[in-house]
């Protein structure tokens, strides 16, 4: 069986990290599926999904690391095409990726004790994001 749900987010932009673990648990609790996999996917090219320990230190560390790897203020060919100044946003999202697959058993996500599922907004402006959540199993 396959079911499809959505998580709606209004982001502030620029390196915002949003914990969506509770939303995923809520969706699983409403699902008719008890065991399987949950696929989480963000449409678009400047947002990403990952897991981390959602705590204040890492919430600061991740954007700082991204700035070291893919700095905002350098030349990106994307900006030559679109003149929107978010070439770095696309590259950061590409590095992290748009999707996750998480197994679950008895309607419980199989995650580590300190592991949360997060959405990362890399664009330089706010967005309305509609994250697709596909539940597969029995």
Language-model segments: residues:
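Active-site histidine-anchored catalytic micro-motif
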Residues: 1-138
């Amino acid at each position: 069986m396959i079911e499809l749900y959505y998580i709606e987010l209004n982001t502030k932009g620029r390196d915002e990290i949003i914990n969506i673990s509770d939303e995923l648990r809520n969706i699983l609790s409403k699902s008719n599926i008890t065991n399987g996999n949950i696929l989480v996917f963000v449409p678009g090219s400047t947002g990403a999904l990952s897991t981390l320990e959602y705590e204040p230190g890492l919430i600061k560390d991740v954007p700082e690391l991204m700035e070291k790897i893919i700095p905002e203020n350098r030349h990106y060919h994307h900006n030559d095409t679109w003149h929107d100044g978010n070439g770095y946003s696309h590259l950061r999202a590409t590095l992290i990726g748009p999707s996750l697959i998480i197994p679950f058993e008895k309607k419980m996500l199989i995650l580590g004790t300190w592991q949360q599922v997060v959405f990362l907004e890399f664009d330089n402006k706010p967005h309305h994001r509609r994250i697709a959540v596909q539940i597969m199993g029995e």
